[in-house]
Curated annotation (Swiss-Prot):
Function: Bifunctional enzyme that catalyzes the enolization of 2,3-diketo-5-methylthiopentyl-1-phosphate (DK-MTP-1-P) into the intermediate 2-hydroxy-3-keto-5-methylthiopentenyl-1-phosphate (HK-MTPenyl-1-P), which is then dephosphorylated to form the acireductone 1,2-dihydroxy-3-keto-5-methylthiopentene (DHK-MTPene).
Family that this chain belongs to: Belongs to the HAD-like hydrolase superfamily. MasA/MtnC family.
Enzyme class of the recorded protein, top EC level: hydrolase
Gene name, Swiss-Prot/TrEMBL: mtnC
Keywords: Amino-acid biosynthesis, Hydrolase, Magnesium, Metal-binding, Methionine biosynthesis
Native species: Saccharopolyspora erythraea (strain ATCC 11635 / DSM 40517 / JCM 4748 / NBRC 13426 / NCIMB 8594 / NRRL 2338)
GO BP of this protein: L-methionine salvage from methylthioadenosine
Listed transmembrane segments: none
Keyword S-adenosyl-L-methionine (UniProt): no
Protein name per its UniProtKB record: Enolase-phosphatase E1
Gene Ontology molecular-function annotations: 2,3-diketo-5-methylthiopentyl-1-phosphate enolase activity; 2-hydroxy-3-keto-5-methylthiopentenyl-1-phosphate phosphatase activity; acireductone synthase activity; magnesium ion binding
Catalytic activity of the protein: 5-methylsulfanyl-2,3-dioxopentyl phosphate + H2O = 1,2-dihydroxy-5-(methylsulfanyl)pent-1-en-3-one + phosphate
Amino acid sequence: MSASVAARWVVLDIEGTLTPTSQVHVVLYDYARPRLGPWIHDHPEDPVVRKAVEDVKSEAGLPAEATAEQVVAVLHGWMDADRKAAPLKTLQGLIWQDGYARGELTTDYFADVVPALRAWRQRGLVLAVFSSGSVAGQVASFSHTTSGDLRGLFAQHFDTVNAGPKRERGSYEAIAAALGAARPLQIVFLSDVPAELDAAAQAGWHTVGLARPGEPYADADFGSHPAVGAFDDIDIEVVS
């Protein structure tokens, strides 16, 4: 499997595309889960935490006077269901940011990822990230990796708060506007989730699916999207 596209911007998913799913669902989720309650308890005056808690109550239909324990129970339920709720992602991102800063977390990537990203960047492609994880969490994850600090590789970061849901066309249109792309076809989106690729294609983007061996979407039907098993199989012609 191989794919050839012409683009100026490369927008990347993280889970299942840059990192193994286990990096998120085992390492990061297991790190955040027991820390959600203590984080809320220890940061009562943090406006970001307060808003996240209020949003949890609103989305879950909890009363305003609901306890922190009730809020945490909802958050744990969302984690169990793998629901990409914005307030959950905000709180997880804060916890992960702290974990990376403490040196307790390190991001590991598929072997083909970092060499490809560096090569694309050196050739003049502009790299950006679109993930359901918060921007704060994204930036932190690139700061402490098995390949060093990779933050300098990426020009912009997008999440479900500043762009929108990953399976909706409008989110990709918003990203294209933020990137300043004169034409949507100047952008290629790399993801392992067919529904996300569908939304990007509806917005006029190029798309490439990642069918990585052993990952949840390895045997998915990517339809009209070209699919590859690794970044080594993608040829991107740089356009202005």
